[in-house]
Amino acid sequence: MSVIKSFPDRYASKVATILMLDEEINKMLYYNDKNDVDIYTLPRVKNPVGTLKDKKVFLNRRVAETFKESDVSMFVNIKNDAPHSKYGKTFRYIETLTLEIGVICHNACRNTLNGARESVIFDRVQRILKTNEDLQCIGEPILSPTTQSYNIPYEYSAYIVTMKVDYFGEM
């Protein structure tokens, strides 16, 4: 078994794990075939990380192909890892990691009694990213405005948020 050594990989893995362990998110991802019941009243997802990782939640890659059936998934990607710069000055010992967190949902499983599935998931993702103290580094994470992805087939909806964190190069 390999040990993740670099901070960017450890941090992306931590973000994905925290999101998969959230009960609201994992139920919305796991019970993708349930549209006409209150998804939050359904049984807990057993072993959410083992159940969702590389099936519904993808780390450092986008969804490999469009789904053959109605489905929903999420991805956490390292977008950039570079020396921190501010006001035109680059800092030698501080790095800035940029992550993309996205949700893609087929229209057939989109509407639920709890709201639009991808919107419910994305709202929860943003609340976690803004408030989870385990995700702080040098200061708090900075979130960009959420954007809709238009380069997907018409029958899907997708949203992406970019998150930046500063860290010491040897963290």
Where do the protein language model's features map onto the residues?
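Acidic-leaning, charged glycine-interspersed low-complexity segments
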Residues: 71-74, 116-171
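Extracellular/virion structural assembly segments
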Residues: 92-94, 106-127
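Beta-strand elements of well-folded, non-transmembrane domains
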Residues: 80-84, 101-109, 164-171
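A small/polar active-site loop signature that marks catalytic segments
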Residues: 97
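Small/polar-rich, solvent-exposed N-terminal microdomains that initiate assembly or binding
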Residues: 1-87
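Short, solvent-exposed beta-strand/turn "edge" segments of beta-rich domains on protein surfaces
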Residues: 86-94, 151-156
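A short, hydrophobic secondary-structure junction motif
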Residues: 61-64, 102-107, 126-131
